[in-house]
């Protein structure tokens, strides 16, 4: 097991995701030049960088240490004005100096392999379903389900194939629902509703970055690499603290539709109609 309460574990998770090939445009933590490539190419998604001083890594082999300003990341990646935004604070939690050419310490390979094997199990499950000619949609959430979620999932099921509730269960901000609660609630939902074996629960160990529109693209790219056929993008996707407009991620990702190799189901959330009940 791994300790999700350890704030440094997010970098081990990022590292494992990169090495497993789940991060489409990265094969290691980014250097300075690669970061600017991410900034220029918004369809790359959210950049994963490694700050100095993370206990899981040996920095002795590092030959490139670079500094990145908070203003740059705030303006070009998060595209917000709130300097104390939670996503920005997480990004710079260990300072403004970063590197990329490091090695994983031997004593943490067990935790690294746990992440790899957990996600590999999901990939194998998806491949098993796809081998039966199923069309698979990933439904992202970090909240417990409400009736609106059920309506969206039912729409997805009515359109085509099977739906996998696929939350990111890496590190999260204070106030987000714990992974154990999501696991318990969604499994109970599936067991109590008649979904005819078309709705599944399959989380992936990956981190929330709270990057708004850029992270919505990041989520699309991860689902492509996991092996999904389709991903749902909706209202308030991957933001926090109301710094993004409700449909900002929706509009941002829709403009880049030609850049994705999987289908996207765009929705504007669900609403209750008092007139029609």
Model-derived segments and their meaning:
Residues 1-277:
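Active-site cores that bind ATP or allylic diphosphates and position pyrophosphate for catalysis
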